[in-house]
Design a protein with these regions (language model features):
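Catalytic cores of the polymerase beta-like nucleotidyltransferase superfamily
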Residues: 1-479
Length: 479
């Protein structure tokens, strides 16, 4: 049994929270089920962080019975969802997602992360929590209402920005290997340091992550990617050995190689720098995934040329092909999100290449045509991709990049090429020349599209119709 430490904390609760908590106190006293607020809500209150409107309650008794009684006394009598197999109940009130569970103790079998559950005390319930900062509880009992129950010094760990487990971390992570990902996620989100024995235990138990479903691993990975400094999470994943297991394609970006005095940058660190560079400009998870995958094919395309050194020709094309494979393996969505990332990986060199030459209107038109509505995202990615430490190069790249961006804006306003579709359809071509679907239709359509993109004709119906007639005559077609 752990002797609980308590703190008198002046918590600030909203009007809705205070009303709810006092109602819970009254019902728990009536049922003789001592009740406590636990988990992330407590942690985030102490950190003055916004929380996601979900609050977990533990009672020494039946969580389901307590939830049903409370809901019956609240305005609107919210519907209670019962999960009898887990001894939990859930309902929504005043925009808050509330979950009630009876205090329990847990034990695990090695081949599964699903616990064997028994009724327990508050101390038992706190002992089963993943980290000390998540094992604190706020009492809702009349005798010590609002007191923080903190048996594992979670309050001190919050102040010291330390992440540690309440018990032996090797047992914690072996029992529930997903907690290794959660440790790295919390360290990344909160900018905490993982205590050394806890960090060592992740390395010791890394192979256990293989019993966790891919969906749960990817969910934690996405939360790391959405953090303020996602690179921290990837570095921790790499240092603990988890990265090589859960995302070997990214792990393979690591390292440098020197041949004949010529080396190349570490593509892993470069990619993480690009990812961090994006953070101030976007919370879009899929744009951040595009940053992660933009150079993913460099190991597969790396070659050494004695004259110019290391090359990665075609890595954008190979990388776009790899995107679908990676999304499928990681159980990421394979529809619009995957196609968006695939497109940005394929096009990520194009805007940068335009800054290195006398850019033509034709080249910009083609980029506008291919990028479509994703042009702004592509430009954000390309701007983040400028990671050279040479200040003069950065200045030159940025100036040239701004010039290209302005030219894109000017051409877009003039030619309206975003989501461009030629004004002449295949149906009109077939109708005009009495054709069935076939080679000639494709030739005429391609000819019109190329003429517009090259600036030979404007993007309007009359010019395109005349070009259609001319090309039809050239092909010997009659209308």
């Amino acid at each position: 049994m752990v002797d609980p430490k308590t703190h008198k904390i002046n918590f600030h609760f909203t009007k809705e929270e205070k009303f709810l908590f006092e109602k819970i106190t009254a019902v728990s006293e009536e049922l003789n089920y001592p009740c406590y607020i636990v988990g992330g809500y407590v942690r985030d209150k102490l950190l003055y962080r916004d929380f996601k409107k979900d609050i977990d309650f533990v009672c020494v008794g039946s969580g389901i019975e307590l939830a049903k009684k409370i809901a019956s006394l609240l305005p609107g009598k919210p519907l209670v969802n019962e999960f009898k197999n887990f001894g939990t109940a859930h309902f929504t009130y005043a925009g808050l997602e509330l979950e009630f569970v009876g205090a329990r103790r847990e034990s695990y079998q090695r081949e599964s992360r699903k616990p064997i559950v028994e009724d327990g005390t508050l101390e038992d319930d706190q002992l089963r929590r993943d980290f000390s900062i998540n094992a604190m509880a706020i009492s809702l009992q009349k005798k010590d209402w609002g007191i923080l129950v903190d048996p594992f010094n979670g309050m001190q760990d919050l102040e010291d920005k330390i992440l540690r487990t309440p018990t032996d971390p090797n047992i914690t992570f072996s029992d529930d290997p997903l907690r290794m990902m959660r440790a790295i996620r919390f360290a990344t989100q909160l900018d905490f340091t993982i205590e050394q024995s806890t960090l060592d235990a992740i390395s010791n138990n890394k192979e256990r992550i293989k019993i966790i479903s891919q969906e749960r691993i990817t969910d934690e990975l996405n939360k790391i990617i959405l953090a303020v400094t996602p690179s921290k999470g990837f570095i921790l994943l790499s240092e603990t050995g988890l990265l090589e297991i859960i995302f070997p394609e990214f792990y393979n970006l690591n390292g440098t190689e020197i041949n004949d005095g010529k080396g190349h940058k570490n593509n892993c660190y470069h990619t993480l720098e690009v990812l961090d560079n994006l953070v101030p400009y976007t919370n879009d998870l899929w744009l951040r995934w595009a940053a992660i995958l933009h150079d993913i094919a460099k190991p597969a395309t790396k070659k050494f040329d004695a004259k110019i050194g290391w090359t990665f020709h075609g890595h954008e094309v190979v990388g776009a092909r790899m995107t679908k494979q990676i999304f499928k393996k990681l159980k990421l969505p394979l529809q619009n999100e995957m196609r968006f990332v695939e497109k940005l990986v394929l096009l990520h060199l194009r805007p940068i290449s335009l800054t290195k030459e006398n850019v033509t209107d034709s080249a910009i038109r083609r980029l506008l045509f291919e990028a479509g509505d994703d042009m702004e995202s592509l430009l954000l990615l390309c701007n983040a991709d400028i990671t050279t430490k040479n200040r003069l190069k950065v200045k030159r790249y940025k100036e040239n990049f701004e010039m290209v961006k302005q030219k894109i804006i000017d051409l877009e306003e003039r030619d309206h090429l975003r989501n461009f579709q030629p004004p002449i359809t295949g149906e009109l071509i077939m109708q005009t020349f009495n054709l069935k679907p076939g080679r000639e239709v494709g030739i005429i359509k391609d000819h019109i599209r190329e003429a517009i993109l090259d600036g030979v004709i404007p993007n309007n119906y009359d010019a395109a119709y005349q070009l259609m007639m001319n090309k039809g005559a050239e092909l010997g077609l009659k209308n």
